[in-house]
Amino acid sequence: MRHHFALFGAKCVFLINAKLAFLSYNRINNDLEEVRKMDYATAKLAEEKVFKDPVHRYVHVRDQVIWDLIKTREFQRLRRIRQLGTTYLVFHGAEHSRFNHSLGVYEIVRRIIDDVFSGRPEWDNSERLLALCAALLHDLGHGPFSHAFEAVFATDHEEYTRAILLGDTEVNAVLRKVGKDFPERVAQVIDNNYTNQQVVSLISSQIDADRMDYLQRDAYYTGVSYGHFDMERILRVMRPRKDMVVIKASGMHAIEDYIMSRYQMYLQIYFHPVSRSAEAVLNHILKRAKKLSEEGYQFKFEPVHFTPFFSGEVLLEQYLALDENIMMTYFQFWMDEGDLILSDLCRRFINRDLFEHMDLNPEEEPERYAWLIEQVKAIGLDPEYYVKPDSTSDLPYDFYRPGVVPTKRPIYLEMPSGEIRELAEQSHIVSAMANNIKTDYKVYYPKEIHFSS
C-alpha cells in the first residue's frame, strides 16, 4: 500500500512539474513574442530609402514598418487612384495619385515629429510610429473617382479604410506585427477618436499634414500658383501642448497665407465647373449601368467588376479589385454598347465631350429649371441622364463658438505670454473669412442645347 502511495505521489509531482514547465514555456514564448514585436516596432532599415518628390524634394523612410506598409498590395493600389479624380480633364498635369499624396502626408508628419517635436517634454515619442502609420494610411480606402463613385453606390471610403486596416489584408498583417491592438489604434487616429489628440491633430485638423500636402501637391500638378504657402515656416512654429498642437503667434501671417491658399484652391481647382461637368457625366454612366443591370440588360462587355456594387453586397477583396484603370477600360468597351444612353455617355467622358453649365438653383428658380428639362426632352434626350443639378460649398475657416462643435479642430495660437488663443480672435483676415460659407449652384446639360444662360 505504501508503495502505491509513493508511486501516486511521484506521479503527482511529475504532473505538477510538467504543468509548471508548460506554463513557464508559454510565458517565455509570450515574452519572446513581445520582445519580437518591440524589436519590429523600433527596427530600422540597414540603409535609408528615399523617394524623389516634386513637392518635398525627398521622402525619407528609415522605419522597417513603414517600408513594409508601402510594399503592401493595398497601398500600391493607390497608384491607380488619382488624387483629383476628373480634374485631369481640365488641368492636364493633374495625373498624380493618392499614392503620391499619402507619401507626402507621411513625410510632413515625420518632419514635424523628428525635427520639431522630438525631445520636447509635451510630446510622447512612443506615439511616433502610430502617427507615421496613420499619416501614410489615412486615404487607404478611397475608391476610383471617389466622389462620383460613392454618390451612386453609397460606399464610404472612411469605412473601407477601417476595413482594410482591421481585415484580412497585407496591411493588417504588418500592423499586427507591431502589436495586436495596433491596427485598431491606427484606425482610431484616422477616425479622429484616439485618446491622444496631439496625434489626431497632425492628421486631421484645420492645419494638418493632409491639407498641407494636398494644397501644395495639387497646385504643383495643376500648374497654378495660388496653392503655395510657407510650409517651412509653419512647421518651425508648431508646438505640442496638452491635448493639442498650437502655432507660435509669430507664425500667424504664414497661417493666414495658408488659409487664403486653401480658399483659392477650392474656388479655382476643386470646384472648377468643367471638372464638375466631367463628374456629372461619370455619375450618370454609373447610374445608367446600374439601372441596366437591375433590368436584366445583356451587356456586350459584362460588368463583372461592377456586379457586387450593383447588388450592394461588396466584399473587401472585390472593392480592392476595382481601380480607375479598370473603370476606364469598361467605359471604352461600353462606347460600343447597344444601349444608346450608356454608349453616348461613355463616348462623352472618354472624348471629353462634356456638358455645359448654367448658374441655376432649381429650388429658387423651379420654372427656369422645368424649362431646361423640356429643352432636353425636345432634342430626344432623357433628362434623368442628361441634366445634373450640382452645388458646391466650402468653409474657409471654422472658428470656435460656444455650444457649436466645429467640423475640424480650430487653429490655436500660443502668445508670448503662454496664453492660448483661437486664431480668429487675433487675425482680422481670418475673422473676416470665418464662417463665411459660399455655395455655388449650377445645372449641367448637353452642349446640343443652344441658348444664352
Regions found by a protein language model. Name each.
Residues 1-2:
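Short polybasic linear motifs
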Residues 130, 135-136:
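Elongated alpha-helical scaffolds
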Residues 137, 141-142:
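Short active-site segment of divalent metal-dependent hydrolases/proteases
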Residues 11-130, 144-148, 154-453:
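Histidine-centered, transition-metal-coordinating active-site segments
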